[in-house]
Amino acid sequence: MGNSKSGALSKEILEELQLNTKFSEEELCSWYQSFLKDCPTGRITQQQFQSIYAKFFPDTDPKAYAQHVFRSFDSNLDGTLDFKEYVIALHMTTAGKTNQKLEWAFSLYDVDGNGTISKNEVLEIVMAIFKMITPEDVKLLPDDENTPEKRAEKIWKYFGKNDDDKLTEKEFIEGTLANKEILRLIQFEPQKVKEKMKNA
């Protein structure tokens, strides 16, 4: 499943990535060359991923969020991402289809990987998101969601859960699709992320 360490992206991986993402062959090949230059082993570590993420958010602390994003895409749990996992991470966090993004968001919020989400896991991810919001932007948030605790509480109430309840993937996806307010609360301003990536 991994990539060859030569300078060419395998035809199978290229076709699979084109099919599953919005990226062109030219973009993928160019990114692959850059990826190999920065990661000659053909794999990116969590620390390297966090460094790349930090470039997009120089005025905040994206380390915790980047760590959770990395975990959610490290499908074989080897502590690295190959090029395919890396591109899918980029795609899902910027332009994936809504259902795919929600499946990914569930895996992001399912911190312990047990197949359900607890209120504490929601709080952990929301705290990581808040570290990426500038103090000026936090001041613009409504009073009932201007701290991680308030936002986590608001999300949990939208799902109609008690503090010690768990949320399944099905409930998470259906609840989010049925309520645009939940979608807004669980994500980190994807439009700003897209703009930063385009200008990088």
UniProtKB/Swiss-Prot annotation:
Site positions for Interaction with GRK1: K192
Modifications after synthesis and translation: The N-terminal glycine is linked to one of four different types of acyl groups. The most abundant is myristoleate (14:1), but 14:0, 14:2, and 12:0 acyl residues are also present. The Ca(2+) induced exposure of the myristoyl group, known as the calcium-myristoyl switch, promotes RCVRN binding to the photoreceptor cell membranes only when intracellular Ca(2+) concentration is high.
Membrane-topology annotation of the record: Lipid-anchor
Keyword Repeat included in the entry's annotation: yes
PROSITE patterns noted in UniProt: EF_HAND_1, EF_HAND_2
Keywords, comma-separated and alphabetical: Calcium, Cell projection, Disulfide bond, Lipoprotein, Membrane, Metal-binding, Myristate, Oxidation, Redox-active center, Repeat, Sensory transduction, Vision
GO molecular-function term, one example from the UniProt record: calcium ion binding
Cysteine sulfenic acid (-SOH) PTM sites in chain numbering: C39
Tissue: Retina and pineal gland.
InterPro entries found in the cross-reference section: EF-hand-dom_pair, EF_Hand_1_Ca_BS, EF_hand_dom, Recoverin
Function: Acts as a calcium sensor and regulates phototransduction of cone and rod photoreceptor cells. Modulates light sensitivity of cone photoreceptor in dark and dim conditions. In response to high Ca(2+) levels induced by low light levels, prolongs RHO/rhodopsin activation in rod photoreceptor cells by binding to and inhibiting GRK1-mediated phosphorylation of RHO/rhodopsin. Plays a role in scotopic vision/enhances vision in dim light by enhancing signal transfer between rod photoreceptors and rod bipolar cells.
Protein name in the entry: Recoverin
